[in-house]
Design a protein with these regions (language model features):
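Bacterial N-terminal signal peptides
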Residues: 2-10
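Low-complexity, acidic/polar, glycine-enriched regions of mature
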Residues: 12-174
């Protein structure tokens, strides 16, 4: 009898651990938004990438991507040049986003996020990624001063960029 129970239960798969899930990514969009004394600004960088985000996986549970800072476009050459100067694009041409330990939380995901920009690494332990039909997206609220940068000031102080910035990133699914 014990042998029968062992074979019956021994081949059972535990149901309390969700299956690994692979999400194929084909495009990434990063947007930096903020305010200045003359209004709102929005700078974005969209690029093609072929990669996979593994959810709830022990095998490969890290997603890394490099972001070329010179590819950001603010819709206006002067603003784009100001952003590139502010983030020191000549000294730090790339930023890196590393998402790891990705776990489902309802229909969304919780993860660890490391964002390496200039020579600083910002670490977020329980970062929420929102899952929609066509993309996975997250939002970081931070300050230029968090990464030891000075917001741009132009025209003898008439135009000042506020310290607060929002970074939205979207990982588009295949």
């Amino acid at each position: 009898m014990g042998l029968v129970v062992f074979f019956f239960l021994g081949s059972a798969k535990p149901t309390f651990f969700p299956e690994d899930t692979a999400v194929a990514i084909n495009k990434i969009k990063i947007e930096i938004t903020g305010l200045s004394t003359v209004g709102k600004y929005n700078c974005s960088n969209t690029f093609t990438v072929k990669d996979t985000v593994y959810v709830n996986s022990i095998k490969k549970n890290t997603f890394n991507t490099d972001i070329k800072m010179s590819n950001f476009d603010c819709g206006n050459k002067i603003m784009t040049k100001d952003l590139q100067g502010t983030v020191k694009v000549k000294k730090f041409p790339n930023s890196t986003v590393c998402i790891s330990d990705i776990k489902p939380i309802g229909k969304n995901y919780k993860c660890r996020l490391n964002f390496f920009i200039t020579d600083k690494t910002l670490k977020y332990k329980d970062f929420i990624l929102y899952n929609t039909d066509d993309k996975i997206q997250g939002t970081l609220s931070l300050k230029f001063s968090d990464i030891d940068l000075e917001p741009p000031v132009k025209m003898a102080g008439l135009i000042k960029v506020k310290d607060d910035i929002i970074i939205n990133f979207s990982l588009y699914k295949n």
